[in-house]
Amino acid sequence: MHSREVSSVREDYREKDMARTTFNIGCLVVLLGTIAYTQQAPEPASAMTTTAIKFLDTLNDEQESAARFAFDSEDRFDWHFIPRERKGVPLKTMTSSQRSAALDLVRSGLSEDGFTKAESIRQLEQILFELEGRDIRDPDLYFFMVFGEPGDGNTWGWRYEGHHLSQNWTIVNGTAVAASPQFFGTNPAEVRDGPKRGQRVLGSEEDQARSLLASLNASQRASAMLSDEAPRDILTSSEREVAMLDDLGVSQSDLTSSQQAILWSIIEEYATAQPATVANQRLDEVREAGLTNIKFGWMGGAERGEPHYYRIQGPTFLIEYDNTQGNANHVHSVWRDFRGDFGRDLLAMHYRRFQHDEPVNAGE
């Protein structure tokens, strides 16, 4: 065979090998994409429904009776974050398998970071017990309440709550999720002794706000500083429904691009305690209502260790953070949705849609 013919044959083989390689890589990409898709976590509503059913199935009759409430029960709105007597079924009465199912339910309602915060807050109760010796300080005094009947296409809700923790979810039509009020608190805000010394469960919420405050120029700071004295607690407390607070603070539109980025990062810190789908929905609503309508306000001292409070408020939402009690080592923080706490906006849309059709399936 002549050298020119040999060269031509080799070129043909080279082209065929390249084609086979390209085809194989393409198949691999498709395969990996398929695997990634099939391994994606289920949507929050579906995940919560599945894990709630599994959790309820683990309970005995007495526990299930304590955990279940009608969807239209007034108890659904009776949320709080202080160490008080609560309804529901507590971790304290659960077996190890029941506890595992209960915490799986919490995982389904929060992001990984949100779940870590919730568990860290619960474990702080052990530190308080060691400091105070009071039985009310107990990491097992966290309660579960289920409102209505979890199921595909159903409207129902649930709450996970104890000292410094209140997470409230409403699932409408088995698909839409509302996840507020959302409360996280810490005492101590910074652990100063023992094996967990230096732990600051809500440290990012404070540090980023301080970074924003420190970046303000004199004019911006004059708008942002609402008072030299911080309130003793978040202003909305545990109210069932909240309206906008005074429209005060420095406006997002008056911030530089780098300051706006810090402000948005703080908002994300609170929003992303929820699963990605819910968090993105929250953030989309914030954007749609207009970023320039958001204001940041500060009360109290600007130095670390001084009592302080801040809030971030837009047309649809309110973030409050207060650290005044316990020598400014005791944090309360909350995300409120003016229209959507306890799923009010989702339920209103649902009822309007079905006003002349079938009644809502709330598992009654």
What is each model feature region?
Residues 5-17:
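Short, Lys/Arg-enriched N-terminal segments with co-localized hydrophobic residues
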Residues 15-26:
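Bacterial N-terminal signal peptides that target proteins for export
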Residues 25-34:
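Bacterial N-terminal signal peptides
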Residues 39-111, 115-364:
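A cross-kingdom marker for long, charged
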